[in-house]
Amino acid sequence: MKTKTILKTILMCLGVSAMSFATHIKDVQAVTEVYGDGEKLSTVILTYDQMIKGDSVSKDDYSVPNRTVKKAYVNNTAQKSNTSKKRGKYVIVELEELPLEDTSMDMNPQDEEERKKRNEKGVSGPTLGGKGNAKPLENITAQITQKGTVVTSNGKKYGADSTVLNSSNTRQLVIEDFVQLTFTDKDGKTLMYNLYKPKNYNPQKKYPLVVFMHDAGAVSSEHKYTLSQGNGATAWASPEWQKKHESFVLAPQYEVVTVNDKYEYGPELD
């Protein structure tokens, strides 16, 4: 009996807010979007165990490491909205867009060695058949802390806590709408590609086909690299564009450099 009493006292001393915070936030989801310079974290979505009052939530209630919170609001679905709902189980935390990155000087060690060899031979630009200089795709996640108090629809307060919560899953907006496929020719050679099909596809209709071919900087063995490295492909599959111009979007993913600066090309281009 004494043991139970002592344990209860210890838990009370630790603070009710810390326990309720961990208990009442049931899930943290990271959401990415693709910008001109690549895929980045844009939103964090919190799922609570009770309806949260919309007027009890503000951007100052949440903190994301190394990012600025643009706005925070309540929704009744796990997605962004133009307006906050009066109540909902989801708190949407939108982040300020990061400044554009200059990736022109990014170089993998192997590619730096290749570049030196080319310079010694007086050759500039990508080497035909080379592997390019693409970095491995980053697994984007999110961390978030609730630093303010939010209120449930029945008046219960969920207090602030310094606990840092990690995302359990990541949504890749627009990227997730592409399917990954591989083409195999009669000689057994393969080419990876990503394909977007209009959401309201009607086999009785004809649709335009947009083809996006990445440059040597995105040469990679990772199937979705061309979708993540910049918005050259995803821009055409965005809801805004598709609403006006329904179309298929095809984005091949080359594993080697297919054309060099002398306009010489390899068999992959065929």
Each model region followed by its residue ranges:
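A short glycine/threonine-centered beta-strand motif
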Residues: 40-57
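Active-site machinery of serine-nucleophile hydrolases
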Residues: 209, 213-269
